[in-house]
Amino acid sequence: VLSNMTNTYVDFAYTPDKTERGLSWGGFVDERRSFSLLPYDIYRSVRWDDHGRIRDISTLPDGKTPLKARENVIGVQAQLWTETVRCFDHVTSYVFPKVCGVFERAWNASPSWEGTTQADDPAFLQELDRYYSTVVSHEIPYYDEMQIAYRQRKN
């Protein structure tokens, strides 16, 4: 079961903003980063650096051991470590909505854009836009209805 910090550690801050709750020792995780997880090509899961700049994902696997036995990957998992959790609202604001990207990759570990070599590939961006639309139109209203304290995007 894969759980890499760059995409699935939900206790990481959403952004590098110093006022943002969450850890930052391993980067930042937002909905976009959780959605970009590629369980069968984890090196290409890191599409942006910690400053939001696009990375050259075509070279990220260079010199690293390739994953050859896909059948050994049985799932993905989000992690929530509790060093900075002081109340249940902290839990829900860390988890929602960024965990939706992890759910999406657990459901579809080989998205259509998996083989792309550019972080800003149009196929990826189109699917990311569809994902955002789904979260905004279905998930956020549910969180509101259930009175779940989720992290709202800052302007």
List the predicted regions and their residue ranges.
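Substrate-binding groove of N-acetylhexosamine-processing glycoside hydrolases
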Residues: 1-155
